[in-house]
Amino acid sequence: MSKRWSILLVFTVALMAALFHFLPGQAITTGSWGLSFQKEGYAPKGPATTDELSALDAAYLGDTTQKKIYLTFDSGYENGCTAKILDVLKEHNVPATFFLVGNYIERNPELVKRMVEEGHIVGNHTMHHYDMSKYSDPKTFAKELTDLEDLYREVTGQELAKYYRPPQGIYSQQNLKMAQDMGYKTLFWSLAYVDWNTNAQPTKEAAFQKLLPRTHNGAVILLHSTSTTNAEILDELLTQWKSQGYTFATLDNLFA
């Protein structure tokens, strides 16, 4: 090998090493968020580690040394359940975060105002609930979030909290970086179940079987506010979590 090619090879290897060293979360790829539970009562593993996510101001899990739960709801539309959910949260004095889309805010301004008045956080689930991993242009990506910010401001007179949840849990490293550049913190989850299909709602017993054994320290719990089952079981669910020694914290605490 000539001296010239040797120098070129060394330079190329060094450049690639530098790129991999300085790109935050470089192991994160495009995908759909999923979980692998190893043992009941313990935090699951996600497609990316907490360190990889943290480099991009993202998380799926809180402090696993503390018996805290972070309760979140995704709200794509109203199915007659949110008022009851809010009633139960108020009765138990439990804070939650509601990730809303544009259609929800437009059609349910009074419920959105109630969320705010009762001390809950409202987060950004994008204007149209598109697959955001297909958006490589920062301006196009940003518009999905800023349009929702504008709508929320019109309805509540307040600024939207800078928490983002990717629609359908589909994400890419580029998306997470674009959200970070906009000042957002991205939140996935460490516990969920199939509650979103309104045509095939799980029974109360099935829901408890999925949720309670898998609850863990620092759990970020995703429920859908469209679920009639969730509205039915929430009171008992919160009671059981409290009896197990869990307390409920806000995302401000998680990202502190």
Can you annotate each of these PLM segments?
Residues M1-S2, Y163:
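Intrinsically disordered, low-complexity sequence elements enriched in Ser/Thr/Gly/Pro
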Residues S2-T72, E78-D87, E91, A206, ...:
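N-terminal pre-catalytic segment of deacetylase/amide-hydrolase enzymes
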Residues V10-F11, M132, S172, A231:
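Enrichment for repetitive, rod-forming helical segments
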Residues K67-I69, N79-C81, K90-L222, T226:
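Metal-dependent polysaccharide deacetylase catalytic core of the NodB/CE4 family, i.e.
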Residues H216-D252:
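Catalytic grooves of carbohydrate-active enzymes
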